[in-house]
Amino acid sequence: MYIYLKTPLQNHSKYLPHLVEHCSGHSALDAVNFFEFSYGLDGVSTPEYTRFEYDKRVPYEKALEKLFTPLQKSAFLYETKILQEELGDPSYDQRIYEAVIRQYINPAISLNGIEKPSREEVEKYHAMRYRPENVIVTSEKFQVFYHGFKPQNTFDQVQLQIISDTFDFEDDAYFLLLYKNHSAKEYWELYFIFWMLCFCSTFVMRRQEGNYYFLEPYFHRFGEVCWCLFPRLDYQILTPQFFEHGKQYIFKMIAEGYFKEMFFLNEYFYGIPLTRIQVLDFYKNYTYTTFLAKLKAFL
């Protein structure tokens, strides 16, 4: 069972909602609650939502009651130390995601920085966001059990902006393809491109060149912006034949029900409401010529 809450950044920072997530799961540390609620000890905190996972045997009403309970002072003191330890060593994935956001969207945004909010600020954010009208509860297959808000409205249609660039991060070299003010179809187009580049980079780096460790593409989004990062390689393997086989595989994954969480998040949080059938129809008609045109700056 999954519980999702809308938890936007506070003053361009993820620190406060991230700390509240830690504090909300803190009650699972005592022996009375640990075994039943241990799934909820660690949530997943993103710039737009927080997700908690609980055993399906736990009634969601009971889990929500735990999350909505006012935070304890002991939780604030204990989890502040834990979060600072976590943020002291962010993963490569976390660092590169933040780096793109700060360079191409807003340099003021902080996703991995350490701050010192007061206990009152933490309690205020918790009271404002951890309430029934800000929650959606789903099964592990994303059947909605409870929803306190309706799906996200789609973005206002503004002219699409495309950025094609090189992106150097730490010791690694990438290409970047970024869509700003995208429509739902443009979002799914970039996701298709991402998968095709995943197949290509794996084929080249693992199968042809024999590398066990190698850079892989990323697909990310933030607000009205989505982007694909992919390693700076020779993509001559992207022949019409390779494209058609990759397209069939992507089509098969969508048709067989993969990416359930992605469809759910797109509908309720991101304003990208294409159904699975609509995505399949779009991919079915997506051509090699159109694909190459989007990547002409890199090939």
Model-derived regions: residue spans:
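Charge-rich, well-structured scaffold segments of protease-associated domains
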Residues: 23-158, 205-299
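His/Glu-based metal-binding/catalytic segments typifying zinc-dependent metallopeptidases
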Residues: 1-16, 142-203
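Active-site His/Glu-centered metal-binding helix of metallohydrolases
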Residues: 16-24
